[in-house]
Amino acid sequence: MNVPTVLSLSLLAALSLPAAAQTAAPQDVPFEGTLKIDVDATDLQHRIFKVKTTMPATPGPMTLLYPQWIPGNHSPTGPIDKLAGLVIKVDGKVVPWTRDQFDVYAFKVDVPQGASELVAEFKFLSPQASSQGRVMMTPEMLNLQWNTTALYPAGYFARNIKAQASVTLPAGWSYATAMETERRVGDTVTFKPIDFDDLVDSPMFAGKYYKRVELSAGKQPVYLNVFADEAKSLDAKPEQIKAHAALVQQMDKLYGARHFDHYEFLLALTKKLGGIGLEHHRSSENSGAPNYFTEWDKSWTGRDLLAHEFNHSWNGKYRRGADLATPNFNVPMGDSLLWLYEGQTQFWGEVMSARSGLWTQEQARDMLAGVAAQYERGRPGMAWRTVQDTTNDPTMSMRRPKAYRNYQMSEDYYSGGQMMWLEVDSKLRALTNNKRSIDDFGKAFFGMKNGEWDVNPYTFDDIVSTLNGVAAFDWASFLRSRMDGHGSLIGGIEANGWKLVYNDEPNLATKTDESDDKDASLTYSLGMSLKASGDISDVLWDGPAFNAGLITGNTIVAVNGRAFSSDVIKDAITAAKGTTVPIELLVKRLDRYDTVRIDYHGGLLYPHLERIAGKPDRLSELYKAR
């Protein structure tokens, strides 16, 4: 780098420091007064939320922040680009504002002398199509997330800002949220005051078709709030509700404490509202297919979502990594311990689905087989990346599409973490002659102080210390070798009395998914996945399809001279098994049609778990209801 360039950069840095320093760091002091947020959510046609925010103000410079780092997303995903029409008034008079060029979530205002109140009005232009983001408003329902409709004062911990929210809903709509209602006048609902931290943590579902079910009574009740595109989707059978109630019971038996005063499952059964699974302390945002209840046997693969998000009330909300426990929504989050936050929650989500009866044990095993196969054959990226490194993905990638996800890897702290915790369970059992297990870790780490829901952060050393309290071992090395290494993550399968095998029969999960959309999951044979249209949705790095030059986005038009269908390509794979004749594909690449030959002769391969004779079946013990 030449000297003039160095000087220029030094000057730029010097000039930028005052601007960047204008946003006051949050302080643990009370905010005087109440932040009021009033939302008009009636413009369904345009999908616009109209917002009026009112707060006390004192003369001088003031900074308003739009939430940037969103809990549960673990990343700076606050949709600032969808804030529009901002007008700020002080004592009724419009005052100019400027955006901090180095912190685009910060708005600067000079409050005039003698002023006492500031009003900020704006519109949140929610996505009109999935190409713009997650759809949050439809003719039948809406999802109001308060972080999208809030500006708040800089310089304070979010928990020290008292806030009160209200919303005007479409005529006659019902709603559900963890917040307590102060009053409803017509279609305007005003909620009781709450800390701003908890307000953002208390989103709302509202809609035309709604059903509320009590899953657990008592001083800390749990409710299932179901919204749907059509009334018929609300028709749940008693045994289906019983399985959801059993989920609550099984969580109680695991942790022995509830860290909420009440809990609200928010569940949207929809093809219109954008899909979601997002945790909160006293609620969760969930979505499922319209046939969630009405075609119970066909919708089972998505039923672990509620178990996953409910578990987060303990793991992720009550307790979370210390680097995630930030003072407000504009301080960067650290994601280093997501392999516990998300990884163990992924583990418990599937285990609790089995224990509660939301899944059968066979369904749980087949789902686990799919995860294990990923880390045996389907994650070539493990050769160069670690699970620990993927904890940077929320900030680095923000779930943007990837050309080769299995090689680039993406948020593997979920499923990779799940596999590690399965191995931890088997190790705890081995160390204690099957007297202690991961259940004991769960209760010790998350099951204290019933009724308290202030954040209780944890560190890596806390995890190790608690594991040692269950069974003494070199847990630090164990955890670090799995999260920082490039070796196998599936040791917990055989340690629990099962082995991973492949055969030509699709497992239950694959059968269910393929029966819904006629897609073809050929990852462990041709090394690709296909949509019913013939479009390639994924290609396994260095697999047969990859080595034949195929990529995501190509379209298979014909197989061995026959028009493409899922059945046709599966028949071709079966016919080529044990022969020397390649499979011939006609492939559309942009505006070209090419013939591609894949020299693969291994037949169809799908993952399954198979019992190891003579070895104790610890997996069935893990899945058994308590």
Where are these predicted regions, by residue range?
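Gram-negative bacterial Sec-dependent N-terminal signal peptides
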Residues: 1-21
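Early extracytoplasmic/domain-onset interaction patches
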Residues: 24-69
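Non-catalytic architectural context of zinc metalloproteases
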Residues: 29, 42, 52-56, 71, ...
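Intrinsic-disorder/low-complexity, polar/charged segments enriched in Ser/Thr/Lys/Arg/Asp/Glu/Gln
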Residues: 34-36, 48-52, 61-63, 106, ...
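Juxtacatalytic substrate-recognition/specificity segment
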Residues: 53, 213-338, 344, 348
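Solvent-exposed coil/turn segments that connect beta secondary-structure elements
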Residues: 69, 112, 123-125, 170-172, ...
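Extended catalytic-interface subdomain
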Residues: 313, 340-361, 371
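C-terminal recognition in membrane/secretory proteostasis and scaffolding
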Residues: 349, 359-626
